[in-house]
Curated annotation (Swiss-Prot):
Its EC number is 4.1.1.130. Belongs to the COQ4 family. Keywords: Lyase, Membrane, Metal-binding, Mitochondrion, Mitochondrion inner membrane, Transit peptide, Ubiquinone biosynthesis, Zinc. Pathway: Cofactor biosynthesis; ubiquinone biosynthesis. The keyword Amino-acid biosynthesis does not apply. Component of a multi-subunit COQ enzyme complex, composed of at least coq3, coq4, coq5, coq6, coq7 and coq9. It comes from Neosartorya fischeri (strain ATCC 1020 / DSM 3700 / CBS 544.65 / FGSC A1164 / JCM 1740 / NRRL 181 / WB 181) (Aspergillus fischerianus). The keyword Membrane applies. This is Ubiquinone biosynthesis protein coq4, mitochondrial.
């Protein structure tokens, strides 16, 4: 008799009620734990089809409720990128000479590898200075990106990691801030540039915008995202570490990126207008 057969027989001997439940529980544990394939790289967490689906649904709902949960957004990105989309991203790198070098070199973007104090000394309109200035203004760090763990193919996992770590460069080059309205504009742009499903799904967070913000998103920044996302080159193939001293305006032109309307300036002008209107109404009373 097999081990499973002996286990089932033993449980059956304990009673007719407990035996089916205990045997089913054992089978589930055996399927989900013992039959799961081994990790393929350090930190890899293999998932079954059902587990991946549950992760996608759970992280989608959670990130919609709280768009600031970077861990849920990262999990959603990995769960929905498989099987097709992450291979498309990896193949886009393989089809480009610079992309192939990035896959071969496997550079990582951190505050140490980029030497942020040095970037702050570069010319004002350089890519590196623009990036460092954006980080300082938004109060964020390149060291906070989660490591990829739910993508099975090791090379594809690096492609996703590279996209994740380059995200702040996309912010810096476009000038978009990190509050929800800015993130949605950038995610729409990224979706048309990378086709990563998570970036497209993130757009549904527009329901959390105020009416004025929602109108601005659909009238200004979504059209910008469509134009630039469709016209721009594959950003995954940009070797950012090698162009830090390049003029950022020249880079935008080479990549085909149109700079979007300045969200911070727009919000500032609207606050000033609201303040003047409030003072005018108070003066009448």
């Amino acid at each position: 008799m097999s081990v499973l057969g002996r286990r089932g027989a033993g449980l059956a001997a304990r009673g007719p009620t407990l035996a089916p439940l205990a045997t089913a529980s054992y089978l589930i544990r055996s399927f989900s734990a013992l039959n799961r394939p081994p990790p393929k790289y350090p930190g890899h967490v293999p998932l079954t089809f059902l587990e991946r689906g549950a992760l996608a649904v759970g992280s989608a709902v959670g990130s919609l409720m709280n768009p600031r949960r970077a861990d849920l957004i990262a999990a959603l990105g990995e769960a929905t990128a498989t099987p097709y989309f992450i291979y498309r991203l990896r193949d886009a790198m393989l089809s480009d000479a610079t992309g192939r070098r990035i896959l071969r070199d496997r550079p990582r973007i951190t505050s140490e590898t980029l030497k942020l104090p040095y970037l702050r000394t570069l010319p004002e309109n350089s890519v590196g200075r623009t990036y460092a200035t954006w980080l300082d203004r938004e109060g964020v760090s390149p060291d906070t990106r989660d490591s990829v763990k739910y993508i099975d193919d090791e090379e594809c996992a690096y492609a996703m990691q590279r996209y994740r770590e380059c995200h702040d460069f996309y912010h810096a080059v476009t000038g978009l801030p990190i509050f929800v309205e800015g993130e949605l504009a950038l995610k729409a742009f990224e979706f048309l540039n990378t086709l990563i499903p998570m970036t497209g799904l993130s757009i549904f967070a527009f329901v959390r915008l105020k009416p004025a913000e929602r109108e601005r998103f659909f009238s200004l920044h979504l059209p910008w995202a469509v134009r630039s996302g469709l016209a721009s080159k594959e950003l995954i193939n940009v070797y950012w570490e090698e162009i830090l001293e390049k003029d950022v305006d020249e880079l935008r032109k080479e990549l085909g990126i149109e700079r979007p309307p300045d969200l911070r300036e727009i919000r500032k002008l609207m606050r000033q207008q609201q303040k003047r209107e409030k003072e005018r109404l108070e003066g009448k009373s």
